[in-house]
From Swiss-Prot:
GO cellular component, one term: neuron projection
One Gene Ontology MF term: serine-type endopeptidase activity
Matching InterPro entries: Galactose-bd-like_sf (IPR008979), Kexin/furin (IPR034182), P_dom (IPR002884), Peptidase_S8/S53_dom (IPR000209), Peptidase_S8/S53_dom_sf (IPR036852), Peptidase_S8_Asp-AS (IPR023827), Peptidase_S8_His-AS (IPR022398), Peptidase_S8_Ser-AS (IPR023828)
Keyword Secreted: yes
Organism per entry: Bos taurus
Annotated family: Belongs to the peptidase S8 family. Furin subfamily.
Species classification: Eukaryota, Metazoa, Chordata, Craniata, Vertebrata
CDD domains per record: Peptidases_S8_Protein_convertases_Kexins_Furin-like
Catalytic residue positions: D167, H208, S384
Disulphide bridges: C225-C376, C317-C347, C468-C494
Key words of the record: Cleavage on pair of basic residues, Cytoplasmic vesicle, Disulfide bond, Glycoprotein, Hydrolase, Protease, Secreted, Serine protease, Signal, Zymogen
Pfam families linked to this entry: P_proprotein, Peptidase_S8, S8_pro-domain
Role, per record: Serine endopeptidase which is involved in the processing of hormone and other protein precursors at sites comprised of pairs of basic amino acid residues. Responsible for the release of glucagon from proglucagon in pancreatic A cells.
Proregion positions: 26-109
Name this polypeptide is given: Neuroendocrine convertase 2
Amino acid sequence: MRGGCISQGKAAAGLLFCVMVFASAERPVFTNHFLVELHRGGEEKARQVAAEHGFGVRKLPFAEGLYHFYHNGLAKARRRRSLQHQQQLERDPRVKRALQQEGFNRKKRGYRDINEIDINVNDPLFTKQWYLINTGQADGTPGLDLNVAEAWELGYTGKGVTIGIMDDGIDYLHPDLASNYNAEASYDFSSNDPYPYPRYTDDWSNSHGTRCAGEVSAAANNNICGVGVAYGSKVAGIRMLDQPFMTDIIEASSISHMPQLIDIYSASWGPTDNGKTVDGPRELTLQAMADGVNKGRGGKGSIYVWASGDGGSYDDCNCDGYASSMWTISINSAINDGRTALYDESCSSTLASTFSNGRKRNPEAGVATTDLYGNCTLRHSGTSAAAPEAAGVFALALEANLGLTWRDMQHLTVLTSKRNQLHDEVHQWRRNGVGLEFNHLFGYGVLDAGAMVKMAKDWKTVPERFHCVGGSVQNPEKIPTTGKPVLTLTTDACEGKENFVRYLEHVQAVVTVNATRRGDLNINMTSPMGTKSILLSRRPRGDDAKVGFDKWPFMTTHTWGEDARGTWILELGFVGSAPQKGVLMEWTLMLHGTQSAPYIDQVVRDYQSKLAMSKKEELEEELDEAVQRSLKSILGKD
């Protein structure tokens, strides 16, 4: 695994974002997909070249001049590169470059077995959908739910919003999904056709996407199954799983599919959750995601929702480059009594949580939703179930305010998520330097649909985002068997420059470190305002790798709203019984946020809310800084 950089937009002022570019240590697998770039000419020329060489072709929407060639006469997965076909393309004078796509693994997450409210719904499973309205059913804790009832009573159901389910397909003929299915926004990238219907298997293993779709957009009051969180929204099927291996082209094409029609992309999959994998998006997918947040939805940005992972306490979602991306909203899960699910991974990049099952409790404590071939289920689970619930809540907020940007949605998530009655047996709830309460597993709490739509309705778009390299430590530092080296880095957060960052959103610690056993490594970072983020926890089960991390961007959301100026502290050490040793080669601090206070212009309706608290802090800070400027001016005149 190695790192790389990608530039993004004028706001970055030429800054390179450090991102993940991966090289697997495993023996490569080659697919029948090729990335082809032409010297000149458009789609017609590409179709001509492809036809002459026996390929099918698709234009890649996120890059000019790049095409996806696929050859149905080749095996979908083989150990040897097809030199004949690659050289055939490379020798064509119209072709600038041709690259056969390597295959890699992506796994569905959480695919495992396990009344009186003033809302009139006649769907038979509605009373079992405790995550929508929890009255204590299935031994749950009353009131511990997504508070969708308040949003629905305000008239918000997700109308005018389309959610794309990137998965193994959806049963769009299902009577509870058919009326809300958006065929125009759907596509099957596994079969290259516009019909993303799941491939049949005897064990129904390809029901994953259909279940996720039902959580979001199942129709209401049709006497079938249950209802979606945003039952007035449209759902699009993007079939891209269910093939021997994933490729960068298929992932990138899925993430960038119809970005002016699809508002929210929901992903309940990622690298293998085995406690030893460090993996994430490749070059094209990173480019597609950057393109999505910059250009999607007419420039407001595509909203990417990601399941944080199902590796449990033996894994860390900061080793997943999708869940830990700044461009995604990473969602964890709680069970219906507020405890953590046994499969929950914890990490500092998780923004919030929703609900799923995950302990051997009441058989009706799973997630009720649609299933294949017109059926219903009570057994959907994992963070796979959590991400679509979040996508549904975000659809309600978008209906309330279609002008919300991808960053607005993250700010709303931080400000309206609630601790409620969530309980993490391992990590305490803490407050960051500006008073925002967070947890290492649950993020800023469980989503509250009612609170989010009410705040979204009056929301003013947050100020422009800037990016600052806060500094870098380049001197190698040995990590002994015992004890933790402490490194410090003092930064002015680019103050006085056009890319000054005053109010933090995301912070990345880009780290290069060698270790005799990567899984025993623990990394913490403390901000100038005293907030400690656990960037990497021990992964005891399987991570025996000696390769360490190479320019890996560990991300934290825990310092949201803080002032980045001052001294940052990085601690590294080994946790475990066997003695280990390592060397920190590099630590670079990347700061992302705004120069002006993001909440100054927001309307406060609840004076006990996090928004009211944050706005008060901002006003006091602005006043203090104004006084300081005045004093300097007066003293300067004297």
